[in-house]
Amino acid sequence: MEYQFTHSIHGVVAKCSMDHEAFARWLNTEITENPKELINIFAEIEKCRAAYPNHYECVFEGKEYSLFLDCDEVMVKANNLDDAFDESQMEDGFQFYDQESIAFCGLEDFENFLKAYQKFSKTYH
């Protein structure tokens, strides 16, 4: 998972590689408004590790994106992705674009992403 953080007049902005764009969108919309939520997320990451090899999962439901954690994988998904969508209504040759709506990564990669965000935020904000 590749990512980059920049600082603008609006604060810290995250950008992620193509397959992980939803993580950046989640961070930019859900966490920048409530950075203290990271404390709860890190606590749940530790619970995931402590539960291994047993199954443990946790969900953080946000306004636009939800975060799903388990022992092996992290998923970020746009809340509107579950809305009913009729593909038969689309014109021929078109596909529904959801690259920025859902993404997956490993628990360790996700934790490193959040720690890098915290470090960047403390240094440049």
From Swiss-Prot:
Superkingdom of this protein's organism: Bacteria
Taxonomy of the source species: Bacteria, Pseudomonadati, Pseudomonadota, Gammaproteobacteria, Pasteurellales
The name this protein goes by in its record: UPF0231 protein APJL_0987
Family statement: Belongs to the UPF0231 family.
